[in-house]
Design a protein with these regions (language model features):
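Short, active-site-adjacent cap segments at secondary-structure transitions
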Residues: 80-81, 133-136, 175
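Short, well-ordered beta-to-alpha junction loops that form the rim of enzyme active sites
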Residues: 43, 129-132, 172
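Mid-chain, well-packed structural core segment of small domains
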Residues: 101-138
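Extreme N-terminal starter segment of soluble prokaryotic enzymes
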Residues: 34-38
Length: 184
């Protein structure tokens, strides 16, 4: 997959400048009138960009984000993969699809391009689709195409975390919204 050295090389290839903004979620200043900005997996917003041509629309997330500035990102499409496309999973250090093709280069390019867009937009938080080889955070499919989950992060999440950019899955975000709304 993408080591820090490979990451630095990818940054050079797509001309991504160094991150200057402190984006740790603990340091996000919540002041009256401040509206948070979000970068969000396109599929969560109803865009048909999943491998099977569908989406993972989250009506609750879409409703919440109506009042916020949002950047939609799909690293797989940015990397040149078509819609629909063969299902892909992380397999060791590579991303393989169900047709046996190594699509690591497309995923790495898409992740680097998504990172560049995200950094330019400067969101307070990135909300991504769980389990994906690009966007999965904490748990991803194991690469055997048997619906088995393992601990790990997708390639875009690895880059974002390396940069210190806060990331949540859709489920984590909605749980936090629910927790905060019942708190106050």
């Amino acid at each position: 997959m993408c080591s820090c050295m490979e990451y630095d090389k990818m940054k050079e290839e797509v001309n991504v400048p160094l991150l200057e903004k402190d984006t740790c979620i603990e340091n996000i200043e919540q002041t009256e009138g401040y509206e948070m900005k979000y970068a969000v997996s396109s599929c969560l917003l109803g865009v048909n960009c999943k491998y099977n041509g569908g989406n993972n629309a989250s009506p609750e997330l879409i409703e919440y984000l109506k009042e916020h500035e949002v950047l939609q990102v799909c690293p797989e499409v940015l990397g040149g993969l078509p819609v629909p496309r063969a299902c892909a999973e992380l397999s060791g250090d590579n991303i393989m699809n169900t047709e046996g093709e190594d699509v690591t280069a497309q995923f790495e390019r898409g992740a680097a391009l998504a990172l560049a867009q995200i950094r330019e937009f400067q969101p307070d938080l990135v909300i991504l689709q769980p389990r994906s080889p690009s966007c999965g955070k904490g748990i991803i499919y194991d690469g055997g195409f048997h619906n088995q989950l393992v601990e790990g992060n997708g390639i875009l999440v690895r880059l974002l975390l390396h940069e210190g950019i806060p990331v949540m899955t859709c489920g984590e975000f909605l749980e936090e919204v629910k927790r905060l709304s019942t708190k106050g």
